């Protein structure tokens, strides 16, 4: 509570009393102190005096509670006024033989405001927009000495006089990003220093400001334009220029399906990524929505997603396993709006169905028939493939390519006999010399004289058997010594013969041309065929 006002001491009053008393003449009433400032509810002592020595009457008129203190003198009285709640002017009066008179003292009551309140700030304030601060002040006196300040932290934004009851003070300030989290408050100052008192301050509770900056551009939404039923797609929504980005929220939804995104925050940007899986109930056109919410504003982007159902095409064979020579129908069928293509089939009009007739051969065993179906969805082509394999049953085969009929190997060399039998089912193969000595097919062996000879290779399966003779020749070192010079001599003689023939031919041509030139006969091109 503010301190009490000054109380005049009795000795001082008595001393001053004589100075205030006037000599004989016109009647005059005096009051001391003439002015007093005191806290509301306080008390004060006031002296009333008359100019004559023996006043007929001397007193005070006031609505305030009063009582006379001290014995007083013939021409003065002292009163104590208590519970002073508001400004007042008590009046001292006197009635002397030469006339009546009166005098007033001015009581000024001071008190600090009962309520200093800053109006609530908006939950979110857009950056770049002006903010209006409003402060209400109830009570406080004297108003001439009461001012109201609006503050940002301790920085003074505005100072105004308190006018009216309650007094309301407003000011408008621009808001930037650096104002986010700043505290704003209202403060009153009751300056009684001119009355030799002090400065009284009252401050409201601070309010914290939250600012935000949401760009006018909509979020960027990246997603597939088409989605197949029971498949999963990825949706990414991003936006730059957000402040404060940590307070931004993202909402992603496909139709009635709310997505659960994972949000990654940058300095002033965010990216929300979510997986979406669609069902047959959602087939058709759906709206994909991305909303970024910050403060009390939202930016949205919408995109159309087409959800479709497209089963893989069916590839059907008359029978997946047939005997050699059997006719097989290969058929591919897909979605009614799809176009199919069977590999290895002559071109057919585009449509959802294709087929052809095949006469199975051993070469068709293990053959894959692939069907490709294409469907147009929302301007995009989507593809599905299906493959079936045909198994052809045929008897054993042994041919020169996979089972050579003659091998010639040097003695003591390392060789691997190879003979592959074909058939479905795969036949068993064995090669025997004289019905007992086996040829180690597929195994690395050291060539010896015992390996030489003719072998009967037999391939057998449930669909029959086939045989083939295979001869193994073993070259001994002596045979190699004889055969090598013979082969070398043959090569030399052959080369010499060819060279002699070419020389004689060129010589005859030159001779013929010379004769023709001498006889004046035009030359004809030589069309003689080159001898083999």
From Swiss-Prot:
**Molecular function as annotated in GO:** integrin binding
Q: Which Gene3D superfamilies match?
A: Immunoglobulins
Record's SMART domains? Answer: IG
Cite the ranges annotated as topological domain Extracellular.
28-480
Q: Pfam families in the record, alphabetically?
A: ICAM1_3_5_D2, ICAM_N, Ig_2
Instruction: Provide a GO biological process annotation.
Output: cell adhesion
Cite the entry's keywords alphabetically: Cell adhesion, Disulfide bond, Glycoprotein, Immunoglobulin domain, Membrane, Phosphoprotein, Repeat, Signal, Transmembrane, Transmembrane helix, Ubl conjugation
Secretion signal, residue range per the UniProt entry:
1-27
Which family is this protein grouped under?
A: Belongs to the immunoglobulin superfamily. ICAM family.
Its name, as the record gives it, is Intercellular adhesion molecule 1
Q: Which organism is it from?
A: Macaca mulatta
């Amino acid at each position: 509570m503010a301190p009490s006002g000054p109380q005049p001491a009795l000795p001082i009053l008595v001393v001053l009393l004589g100075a205030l008393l006037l000599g004989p003449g016109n009647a005059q009433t005096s009051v001391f102190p003439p002015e007093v400032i005191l806290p509301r509810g306080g008390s004060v002592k006031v002296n009333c005096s008359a100019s004559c020595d023996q006043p007929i009457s001397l007193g005070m008129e006031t609505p305030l509670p009063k009582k006379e203190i001290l014995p007083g003198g013939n021409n003065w009285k002292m009163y104590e006024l208590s519970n002073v709640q508001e400004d007042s002017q008590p009046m001292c009066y006197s009635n002397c033989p030469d006339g009546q008179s009166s005098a007033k003292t001015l009581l000024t009551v001071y008190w600090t405001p009962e309520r200093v309140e800053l109006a609530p700030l908006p939950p979110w304030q857009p950056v770049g927009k002006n903010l209006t601060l409003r402060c209400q002040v109830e009570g406080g006196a004297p108003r001439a000495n009461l001012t109201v300040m609006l503050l940002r932290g301790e920085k003074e934004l505005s100072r105004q006089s308190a006018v009216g009851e309650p007094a309301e003070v407003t000011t408008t300030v621009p808001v930037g990003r650096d104002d986010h989290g700043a505290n704003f408050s209202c403060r009153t100052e009751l300056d009684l220093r001119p009355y030799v008192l002090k400065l009284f301050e009252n401050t409201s509770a601070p309010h914290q400001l939250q600012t935000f900056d949401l760009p006018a551009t909509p979020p960027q939404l990246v997603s597939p334009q088409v989605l197949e039923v029971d498949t999963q797609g990825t949706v990414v929504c991003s936006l730059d220029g957000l402040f404060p980005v940590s307070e931004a929220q993202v909402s992603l939804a496909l139709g009635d399906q709310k997505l659960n995104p994972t949000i990654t925050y940058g300095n002033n940007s965010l990216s929300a990524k979510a997986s979406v899986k669609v069902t047959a109930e959602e087939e058709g056109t759906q709206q994909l929505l991305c909303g970024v919410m910050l403060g009390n504003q939202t930016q949205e982007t919408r995109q159309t997603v087409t959800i479709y159902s497209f089963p893989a095409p069916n590839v059907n064979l008359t029978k997946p396993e047939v005997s050699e020579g059997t006719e097989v129908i290969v058929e591919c069928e897909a979605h009614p709006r799809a176009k199919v293509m069977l590999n290895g089939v002559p071109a057919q009009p585009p449509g959802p169905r294709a087929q052809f007739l095949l006469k199975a051969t051993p070469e068709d065993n293990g053959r894959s028939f692939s069907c490709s179906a294409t469907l147009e969805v929302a301007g995009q082509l989507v593809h599905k493939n299906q493959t079936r394999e045909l198994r052809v049953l045929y008897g054993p085969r042994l041919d020169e390519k996979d089972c050579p009929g003659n091998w010639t190997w040097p003695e003591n060399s390392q060789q691997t006999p190879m003979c592959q039998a074909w058939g479905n089912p795969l036949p068993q193969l064995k090669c025997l010399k004289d019905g007992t000595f086996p040829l180690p097919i597929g195994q690395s062996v050291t060539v010896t004289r015992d390996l030489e000879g003719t072998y009967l290779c037999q391939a057998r399966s449930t669909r029959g058997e086939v045989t083939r003779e295979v001869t193994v020749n073993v070259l001994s070192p002596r045979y190699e010594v004889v055969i090598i010079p013979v082969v070398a001599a043959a090569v030399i003689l052959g080369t010499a013969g060819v060279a002699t023939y070419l020389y004689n031919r060129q010589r005859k041509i030159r001779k013929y041309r010379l004769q023709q030139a001498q006889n004046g006969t035009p030359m004809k091109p030589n069309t003689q065929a080159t001898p083999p």
